[in-house]
A protein has these predicted regions:
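Acidic, mature catalytic/reactive cores of soluble proteins
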Residues: 1-434
Length: 434
């Protein structure tokens, strides 16, 4: 517990950073001995325990005052060798990471989701979340301006300006000074300093670090996040990146499921449910084409600020959506056995009136299944699963030979589960009562 000093942080960094190379150099020098030793299980457990404590400390140290969590730490090596940590602005992926880490309890997860909804990451018009908070970019004339005091404080820059040497800095018609526009990072600045004529050598030797500090003070390249912080489209400023929203949805599902399993209070579980279904509603499938900016059932990469969905095409988002949907429906697999759990199933999804369910069976034939009011159906490995409400949990297994089997409880045995997974046509329908 407690804070880690910059010097201690450097010591840990060096120790971890050189451990493998020290081992490798020992092997190069002495070769493998061929001898084998025994590592006690308690030693391995102790190592893992220490590692977990440091990981948890790192996560807790990244909690912000607003209840969110920092996503990225920026490292700066100070003049005395210490390592200083600073942070990028709040990011959606940081909140997804902490929720998915399994470290927070149900109440803490609610607090993160509440803070997220109240943050600059929430985009009201789409009722969803942007990757990073929107921001106003500086105008062109506001960029690359060297502060007059900083310029005057550098003997090298002052001398270059007096001599009319524009290799490092230039002066505009209004008297302002700017770094050479061809520099793309501090390495380019260093190369230009090294190539200055020899009369400047002494000034370069004494002022280089200060000049580099002035340069990075203006551009601060380590905080550059690419198109997300500079583009107006293509997942740029104010954009919702739908794959990350689906990751948030999955994280919210996971913490809600865990809260139910751990018997969290009904109030906390209810708030988690609310957040989960709000995130779900914001994703797009239930939106109008006008609001979504495209056909709502079509997959799109992102939605920039002020525009509809852009960049059509299937992304990795689909896997999170599938996991969430089967999770909502209550499909679980434990030790190879299919189980059903109605805890997260929205009661509004049950049919109000009888309906016909069309599906393709494992023999690639279209089938019709008549569903009563108060039921719902879906397929699992092309086997129809019909959910009915009831007080006595159970499963009816309909076999391919026409026989049926009644199962007490909501778990299938291993052989029946395998028959479903293998699409063997041994199981042709499951009716779940819960």
């Amino acid at each position: 517990s407690g804070q880690i000093s910059n010097s201690d942080r450097r010591a840990v960094l060096d120790g971890l950073g050189t451990a493998s190379s020290d081992y490798r150099h020992t092997i190069y020098k002495e070769d493998f001995s061929g001898r084998k030793g025994t590592l006690a299980l308690s030693e391995l457990e102790g190592f893992i325990d220490v590692a977990l404590k440091h990981l948890e400390h790192s996560i807790h140290a990244n909690k912000r005052k607003d209840g969110l969590y920092h996503a990225y730490n920026l490292m700066t090596v100070e003049a005395d060798g210490g390592v200083q940590i600073t942070y990028l602005p709040e990011m959606l992926e940081g909140q997804v990471a902490i929720l998915s880490a399994g470290l927070l309890d149900a109440s803490e997860s609610v607090a993160v989701l509440d803070a997220l909804k109240a943050s600059a990451l929430f985009r009201e018009d789409q009722y969803s979340y942007v990757l990073y908070p929107n921001k106003s970019l500086p105008r062109f004339l506001d960029k690359n301006n060297i502060d007059p005091k900083a310029l005057a404080g550098s003997a090298l820059l002052t001398k270059l300006v007096e001599d009319g040497n524009a290799d490092i800095v230039t002066q505009d018609c209004l008297g302002g000074h700017h770094f050479n526009g061809n520099f793309n990072n501090v390495k380019a600045l260093r190369a230009a300093l090294a190539n200055l004529p020899s009369p400047y050598d002494a000034l370069v030797a004494s002022d280089q670090k200060d000049v580099e500090a002035i340069y990075e003070g203006i551009f601060n390249h380590k905080r550059f996040t690419g198109r997300s912080g500079t583009f107006f489209g293509y997942e740029g400023l104010g954009s919702i990146y739908w794959h990350m929203v689906s990751k948030l949805r999955l994280a919210a599902f996971e913490v809600t499921k865990a809260a139910v399993e751990r018997n969290a209070s009904s109030e906390v579980v209810g708030r988690l449910f609310d957040h989960y279904f709000e995130i779900n509603a914001g994703i797009g499938a239930h939106k109008s084409p006008e609001l979504y900016g495209a056909f709502p059932t079509d997959p799109y990469s992102h939605t920039p600020g002020g525009k509809g969905a852009q960049q059509p095409g299937m992304t990795g988002q689909v896997k999170e959506d599938l996991l969430c949907r089967f999770g909502e429906l209550g499909v679980r697999v434990t030790d190879g056995c299919i189980q059903f759990d109605r805890a997260l199933l929205n009661g509004e999804e049950f049919l109000k009136e009888p309906a016909t369910f069309d599906y393709v069976n494992v023999e690639q034939q279209w089938q019709k299944l008549e569903l009563p009011a108060g039921s719902l159906a879906y397929t699992l490995c092309q086997v129809p699963v019909v959910h009915l409400r009831g007080d006595t949990p159970g499963i009816e297994v309909k076999r391919g030979d026409g026989s049926t089997q009644q199962v007490a409880g909501l778990s299938l045995d291993l052989d029946t589960s395998r028959a479903v997974f293998r699409r063997s046509n041994d199981v042709v329908q499951l009716t779940v009562v819960a």
